[in-house]
């Protein structure tokens, strides 16, 4: 059997991080079996569905590195097919027209509540003849759900889940305006698309029971189902805005690499031994829905940062440079940095990357670590830098300025030799010199190695910054 999975988002907003993991699991399972993953846009809610959201979903999938087969399928464009199936179910005696008015339905619900029953439709039109239909009322179509026993959802993650049929009632499959409900549209589309495996969030389990009833009514084979646990926040609560970023686009703007996010997401609910860093090739080779956990996975930014830091260290400098440039328009002060990135500063930034990527967990930290290159002048000092540039620090700068100025070559070896010789001669620890020098060059107490900074900035810029601090720093 050829495996065909599908990712079926609703285009009402960005690609949610939970949706990205669902897409990843579908993609991996299809790839593992040499099959296909299709993309279906569930856009039947015309009021909330937008073209911008469709674009955001497709862009999000592309960025995170998940491809789909064929063109995206619009559920809305298949409305006529959904209506055709609903009418066929009526002809086959598996569904019926219901003419109940809103007032009658409200009365049914009130009676059910008063009697302590679930507020379900009571099947009033289930066996009535159409000749009894009132004039001027457009009917809905309801499925004839089984009244006795239970509907069983056979799930590869959750096991067999039983739903008493008395709790499911004769639900609507076609509205009075001729539009299908979600339940019907999903079943028809999954059948027509040849979907063999449905991998989605476990919040769809109850839907799965109702969809099973429709599959059985049509005599169609039910795809293998795997309902995966939702992603929760670090506090164990359902993921929401208060837990931080929700959309894939936000993670991109926060400086996460797509390979790192894939690696992190695959470990949310699935694992392969104790492996933390997993290549895409190994994911495809190892992934199986039978290994997905039942319990909800918790979002852990510390772990995500650690994984992202690994991928940053393993990336080439050019790739990091390109990735960083691509997110600048999306981050705070990014446009200011773009304005300053002339040919000279681009070269300096690229040259700085090997010196700062070892300590960077995100691209934002990489940008921050290189900010001394394109910072505004006069240089703004952080509090620690101000402390380092006190009276003693200024005295150091005044002493080493002529030494640096007299260096015949501006390379790390020459600069290292000159300053260490001075420190030894003055019986000073090298850190006593390096700390105020670093503060004068970068405005911070931490940075890449001070000799690397000197070389990156170049002779003139370095001497100008040192001289500027000698002349302007106030003792605190």
From Swiss-Prot:
PROSITE patterns per UniProt: AA_TRNA_LIGASE_I (PS00178)
InterPro entries noted in UniProt: aa-tRNA-synth_I_cd-bd (IPR045462), aa-tRNA-synth_I_codon-bd_sub2 (IPR020751), aa-tRNA-synth_I_CS (IPR001412), aa_tRNA-synth_I_cd-bd_sf (IPR008925), Glu-tRNA-ligase_bac/mito (IPR004527), Glu/Gln-tRNA-synth (IPR000924), Glu/Gln-tRNA-synth_Ib_cat-dom (IPR020058), GluQ/Sye (IPR049940)
Keywords: Aminoacyl-tRNA synthetase, ATP-binding, Cytoplasm, Ligase, Nucleotide-binding, Protein biosynthesis
Positions of short motif 'KMSKS' region: 238-242
GO terms for MF: ATP binding; glutamate-tRNA ligase activity; tRNA binding; zinc ion binding
GO biological process: glutamyl-tRNA aminoacylation
Cell division found in the keyword field: no
Superkingdom of this protein's organism: Bacteria
One GO CC term, this protein: cytosol
Main location (coarse class): cytoplasm
Residues binding ATP: 241
Pfam families referenced in this protein's UniProt entry, alphabetically: Anticodon_2 (PF19269), tRNA-synt_1c (PF00749)
Cellular compartments annotated: Cytoplasm
Motif ('HIGH' region): 9-19
Reaction(s) catalysed by this chain's protein: tRNA(Glu) + L-glutamate + ATP = L-glutamyl-tRNA(Glu) + AMP + diphosphate
Entry annotated with the keyword Transcription: no
Alphabetical list of Gene3D superfamilies matching this protein: 1.10.10.350, HUPs (3.40.50.620)
Subunit details: Monomer.
Protein family according to the UniProt entry: Belongs to the class-I aminoacyl-tRNA synthetase family. Glutamate--tRNA ligase type 1 subfamily.
HAMAP family listed in its UniProt record: Glu_tRNA_synth_type1
Functional summary from the UniProt entry: Catalyzes the attachment of glutamate to tRNA(Glu) in a two-step reaction: glutamate is first activated by ATP to form Glu-AMP and then transferred to the acceptor end of tRNA(Glu).
Name of the molecule in the record: Glutamate--tRNA ligase 1
Species: Bartonella bacilliformis (strain ATCC 35685 / KC583 / Herrer 020/F12,63)
